Amino acid sequence: DVYLASSCTEEWGGDGAPKIVAELQRRGIELFLVCDEGGAIITEPIGGIHGNFAMVGVFEKGKADVKFTARSNGGHASAPSKGTPIARLSAFVNEVETHSPFRKKLLPEVSAMFTELAPYAGFGMKLVFGNVWLFGPVLKAVMPAISAQAGAMLKTTIAFTVQKGSDAYNVLPQEAYVGANMRFIPHQGEKESLEIIKKVADKYGLETEVLHANDYTPPVDIHGEAFHLVEQTIADTFPGLPSSPYVMTGATDAQFYQPICKNCIRFAPVVYGPEQMKGMHGLNENIEYNLSLIHISEPTRLALI
């Protein structure tokens, strides 16, 4: 049987997908394979590797929204004391940005990605990507500089996205805060990553409040039947298109299907060039309509596995 599930609440974290899963559970249905968005046909997936590649998402990093608050007695800005809330928050953000407390590691899925991409790289990158067992330390050191996307596949990340201080320029705030979005990697999951960042925040006298958190999803077996079926379908539909495992640094509704499916794969037959990748959730977000949903006349096999 084939089920087409659609929810309009994914972008804002609504309950559309969980309700669908709850109904499937009520019916006693377990799925062999789920195909959601996330991975795609990506042009230049890593700097220095040119061409189109089917990047198949095999798991999602966990995520959390965290609020860090600094407090003081306030006062007038004409006579500031040291260690104001904003000063402490700034020092905290600076430390986390310049000296990440999270450990980098090459996961099996990431190593497999580099191995698959190696034949399409220049000599130097081909040598490194094709011998991850030897050049792993080099990759961990240079990949964040080459590609932010690849760097995010190596460790837990934190991005500071919200801030608030005083309501007036001449008033020292009694309370100021910054908000951050964290993405957890399997080797330092939700619990460990939150403990690590709290220890750093404690150094600056900050309160840490976790507003929402969920851990990473179990990886799909990249040597299993479901993953190979998707790879074969891609090869049949797009002859000559290389495919590779891919770590989803963002989030999709597929995460909610994990209780009823061991093979939640993130891939849509849509082409994303460098401009589309840079514009995602930003200025001039767009998609090349003439390149999307290629070969839809072929009974849309990939969407209906």
PLM regions with names:
Residues 1-55:
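Acidic/histidine-rich catalytic neighborhood of metal-dependent amide-processing enzymes
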Residues 15, 29-30, 50-51, 59-65, ...:
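Short, solvent-exposed loop/turn segments at the edges of secondary structure
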Residues 18-24, 78-101:
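A short core secondary-structure module
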Residues 42-43, 50, 102-167, 174, ...:
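An extended, acidic, His-containing surface patch that forms the Zn2+-binding/catalytic region
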Residues 49-52, 69-76:
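Flexible glycine/proline-enriched surface loops and loop-helix/loop-strand junctions
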Residues 59, 80-82, 151, 168-173:
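Short, solvent-exposed beta-strand/turn "edge" segments of beta-rich domains on protein surfaces
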Residues 96-101, 199-206:
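A common structural junction motif
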Residues 298-301, 305:
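Positively charged, low-complexity/disordered segments
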